[in-house]
Amino acid sequence: ALPAPLIDRHDVGAAMLQGTSYQEPQETLENLRQAMQTPQYEQSSEIPFGVVRAMLDLGLTYQARTWLESLKDRLSHNWRFHWYSGVTNTLIGDFQSAQANFTSVLVAVPGEAAPKLAIAAIDELILQSNGYLTGALLDDALSRAAAGIRTHLGELPSETFEAWQSKGVLAEDWTMLSDTPTVLRFNALRLYSLVWLTNPTTVSSAFGLARLLMAEREVELAVAALDKVPNSSRHHRMAQLTTILDLVSDELTESRIRRAARRLEEIPNNEPRFLQIKVYVLRAALTLLRDAGVDRAASDHSLFEYEFTTRDLRRGLATTLREQARIAPYARHRYALVDMANKVRPATWF
């Protein structure tokens, strides 16, 4: 979710808006509309923006856009106008307009993280709507430098940028306004990276950065980005679970599968998603052996409590599926898990 800008405390309506913070959205909307009719607040810009917030809270998205259009002549010079227009256009699905709105905000307040995150998210949505959400779009060197984790854009020679510009990968003016897939991916990567590396409290930027790095098949960098989520963050557990999935989601190797298993073993087994992810890792191990046409891994070390062999991994997968079935909330789900366990368990006489 995108944040709402802080209220301008110098605005004549600031005190009134602070008084509505604990009201229901419908009550807030009615009070603000009444206030706008009084001479005391007719010069306020925050009260009209408060109306937009209340409308969005009520799900009145199209009404909010109509209201913003009515404010254009009076308040379009205010960056908050473009922010709320961007949020509204995002909810409506007009991503190109939202991109332009958030770019205007970034020009007005270039040091803020919020417009950078907003543009990166919009670029992802445009890529998704055009079918480019997954799949590498950038040169390896460019995606790694844009991520800013181990290398940086400043370390690349100018000739590299000139070559990318000639290919249309980069815009000559580095504009944020684009519908070109490579430019969208590059901008989103570097904006997520810029926010994450300068403000570690914005954990959403870490997940965004890792998501795009996975699309670029930069698994190790995606894991490195999420490993930087601090232990004190309430999102730390989710970040660690995501790294496990990342390690077994792309090109499978024995090393990555073992690393994923070790990471999962460090997480308490009362974690609600523990068994689900254990199933995912065991399945990845079986897939690795099957695709390689072998019955056992190169190393004799076990994976979890099972030998890294086809037979023992199938036994482990069946056991884990049955454990998951015991805690399944619905009978239909439980039966499906037991059926899956029966299909994968190794054949026995009993």
Q: How should these model regions be labeled?
A:
Residues E42, S76, P110, P200, ...:
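Short coil turns that delineate tetratricopeptide repeat
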Residues L58, I92, I126-Q128, T182, ...:
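Structural motif corresponding to the intra-repeat A-B loop/turn of tetratricopeptide repeats
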Residues R53, V87, A121-D123, Q128, ...:
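Residue-level recognition of tetratricopeptide repeat
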Residues E46-D57, R80-L91:
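Non-membrane alpha-helical segments in proteins
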Residues Y280-F350:
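C-terminal non-catalytic interaction modules
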Residues A1-P48:
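Regulatory extensions appended to serine/threonine kinase catalytic cores
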Residues T28-A35, Q63-L71, Q96-V105, G131-P157, ...:
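Alpha-helical repeat scaffolds
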Residues F49-G50, R80-Y84, A100, A114-I119, ...:
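Alpha-solenoid helical repeat scaffolds
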